[in-house]
């Protein structure tokens, strides 16, 4: 007799299978990097990525000879020392600043290079991001030579409808912007993205209205901002894409409890769209719960390898 399987169960099995195939590869990645330790690395890029935009940009900047390391994986090392000819940080711009985990990683690590660069990925505005990153890095003995940013899909769901973002003409400029940035870094140019008076006005207005912390604005507790709905099938993808490992499966359903970066990796990568955001005034409710985003050049497996804390 032929057995049947519904879509819900099939997706659950796919999710569990994906976790199983991704997890064994983590030690292999670490091993590859260890083997290269004795060789002088040309370009070393550290990245933080929730929906794949920053990972995609990192790959483009790395080229054939660059080495990529995930910040959520590297941050657990004690007193790490990294050395390369060029060292870069690629991360999303969260509330006009680098994510708290990126700040913590820089503060805990020692970097040795002839050339340092930062590239942010953002949707609407960078405002003071270049200045903040430059001053923050300088406080830990790093002189940034180059700071720029790439405008991409804005994935912050309380304010942006992903469906509209995907239709925005700004996305057509991504290849050109990346080409300019890559050429500049290859030539070791000295540059910092300008911060205008309008940028400062937007920054000040946002923080006055929101009341967020101006150093670590997105740090919170996961149970305060996200929850899984009845659409959850217990596939476990959220437990592996969270850079803090703050999701767990309890009786076949995902439960969020723990530190949160507010990166929304869990929300965007859930195959069932079963994770929703709890509105935090003055922020509105998300305008479109039916559309989620992951960079088309990055797979869920890529993000699991980058972020999993299991």
Q: Where do the protein language model's features map onto the residues?
A:
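Helix-loop-strand module that forms the ligand-binding subsite of alpha/beta enzymes
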Residues: 72-152
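Flanking helices and flexible, charged tails adjoining ferredoxin-like Fe-S electron-transfer domains
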Residues: 265-310
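Iron-sulfur cluster-binding cysteine motifs and their immediate structural context
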Residues: 28-30, 227-261, 265-283
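Glycine-rich phosphate/pyrophosphate-binding loop and the adjoining helix
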Residues: 156-203
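Soluble, non-transmembrane catalytic domains of enzymes that act on hydrophobic metabolites at membranes
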Residues: 119, 150-176, 246-249, 253-257, ...
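C-terminal segment of N-terminal export signals and the immediately downstream linker at the start
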Residues: 25-50, 56-63
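N-terminal export signals
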Residues: 2, 9-30
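A mid-sequence, solvent-exposed acidic-amphipathic segment
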Residues: 202-234, 239-240
């Amino acid at each position: 007799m032929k057995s049947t399987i519904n879509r819900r169960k099939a997706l659950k099995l796919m999710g569990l299978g994906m976790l199983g195939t991704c997890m064994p590869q983590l030690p292999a990645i670490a091993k590859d990097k260890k083997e290269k330790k004795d060789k002088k690395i040309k370009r070393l890029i550290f990245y933080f990525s929730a929906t794949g935009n920053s990972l995609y940009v990192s790959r483009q900047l790395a080229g054939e000879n660059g080495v990529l390391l995930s910040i959520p994986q590297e941050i657990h090392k004690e007193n790490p020392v990294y050395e390369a000819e060029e060292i870069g940080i690629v991360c999303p711009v969260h509330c006009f600043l680098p994510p708290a985990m990126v700040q913590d990683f820089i503060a805990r690590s020692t970097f040795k290079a002839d050339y340092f660069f930062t590239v942010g990925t953002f949707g609407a505005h960078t405002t003071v991001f270049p200045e903040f990153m430059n001053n923050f890095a300088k406080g830990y003995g790093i002189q940034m030579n180059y700071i720029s940013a790439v405008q991409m899909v804005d994935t912050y769901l309380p304010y942006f409808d992903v469906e509209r973002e995907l239709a925005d003409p700004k996305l057509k400029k991504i290849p050109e912007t990346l080409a300019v940035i890559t050429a500049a870094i290859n030539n070791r140019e000295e540059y910092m993205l300008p911060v205008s008076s309008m940028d400062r006005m937007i920054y000040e207005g946002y923080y006055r209205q929101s009341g967020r912390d101006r150093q670590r604005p997105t740090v919170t507790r996961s149970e305060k901002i996200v929850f899984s709905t009845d659409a959850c099938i217990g596939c476990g993808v959220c437990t592996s894409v969270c850079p803090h490992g703050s999701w767990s499966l309890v009786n076949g359903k995902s439960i969020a409890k723990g530190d949160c970066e507010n990166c929304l990796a869990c929300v965007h990568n859930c195959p069932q769209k079963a994770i929703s955001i709890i509105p935090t005034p003055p922020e509105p409710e998300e305008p479109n719960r039916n559309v989620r985003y992951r960079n088309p050049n990055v797979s869920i497996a890529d993000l699991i390898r980058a972020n999993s804390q299991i």
